[in-house]
Amino acid sequence: MEENKRKSLENALKTIEKEFGKGAVMRLGEMPKLQVDVIPTGSLGLDLALGIGGIPRGRVTEIFGPESGGKTTLALTIIAQAQKGGGVAAFVDAEHALDPLYAKKLGVDVQELLVSQPDTGEQALEIVELLARSGAVDVIVVDSVAALVPKAEIEGEMGDQHVGLQARLMSQALRKLTAVLSKSNTAAIFINQVREKVGVMYGNPETTPGGRALKFYSSVRLDVRKSGQPIKVGNEAVGIKVKVKVVKNKLAPPFREAELEIYFGRGLDPVMDLVNVAVAAGVIEKAGSWFSYGEHRLGQGKEKAAEYLRERPELLEEIRAKVLERADKVVLAAGEEEGE
């Protein structure tokens, strides 16, 4: 760079720094953190599918899908992981449907969880912004976008038309919120439902409430829905299989998938999840119904194999380390359908 240009740039940078504070503009190579901070999801398979090891801090994540598909369970599991790491979590319960007993079974420290049950969409989003601005909250979950009803709609008469109010509310809030989250390094997770557009003959009839702003401002979007038959022990259904597809990812390649197993009453089982991922990576061998790792015969059936590993934490960690070494194989196995 020419000397005159360099001096002009330095003067401009000094003026900006004086006006807006230190660090307002800096060279990318001088940035203190190029690595993305994350909160683990509680599922190794999903962490690998995300490509960064979890849900990104300082950004917006959208978890959407049909009802009873595991969206809230996944969000509460992420809260539990944040708390295990010494973090502070908040749950904005716009649906007024949070079950503290179920949250506790998923590993959430309900005594320390910050909970808000706002009356209007404006109130909910203002609470999210104020919590993020504090810089003391690690993750904020909003359940759900569909329940963020604008004040004008609540105070209006039944049958009044309020076209586009919620979309405008979300757009205004997210414009401010994204900058606040980035500075405070807070992860914001918005849970959303899917609706069907009336009269769509071609293409995907599904849409999500809240307009386009959330799709645009989200760094990660996860499509969560049931897949296949329920998990059964004998004739009794004990859980559901859930497919999570990363439909948008600004931080790693998108369109990767992970299959989770959610058990009724206890949610995600991390050991069972590890067994599934280790089989996909070729670390654990499966012959018929028998599972084995090297010289260790883990057991007949996945439940027995998981039980064997729970009793041997050192072996469990050894398998986890080998799975992480072969992460590419797991991602390839999860995304095979895309490449067919």
UniProtKB/Swiss-Prot annotation:
Q: Where in the cell is it found?
A: Cytoplasm
Is ATP-binding set as a keyword in this record? yes
**At the top level of its lineage, which domain of life is listed?**
Bacteria
Q: Where along the chain is ATP bound?
A: G65, P66, E67, S68, G69, G70, K71, T72
- CDD domains linked to this entry: RecA
The UniProt entry, under SUPFAM superfamilies, shows:
P-loop containing nucleoside triphosphate hydrolases, RecA protein, C-terminal domain
The record's Gene Ontology cellular component field reads: cytosol
Q: Name one GO molecular function term.
A: ATP hydrolysis activity
The answer to whether the entry has keyword ATP-binding is yes
Q: Name one GO biological process term.
A: DNA repair
Chief place where the protein resides: cytoplasm
What residue intervals traverse the membrane? none
According to its UniProt entry, what is the function of this protein?
Can catalyze the hydrolysis of ATP in the presence of single-stranded DNA, the ATP-dependent uptake of single-stranded DNA by duplex DNA, and the ATP-dependent hybridization of homologous single-stranded DNAs. It interacts with LexA causing its activation and leading to its autocatalytic cleavage.
The record's family statement is:
Belongs to the RecA family.
Instruction: State the name under which the record lists this protein.
Output: Protein RecA
Could you tell me which species this protein originates from? Thermus aquaticus
Q: What is the lineage of its organism?
A: Bacteria, Thermotogati, Deinococcota, Deinococci, Thermales
Q: Which gene encodes it?
A: recA
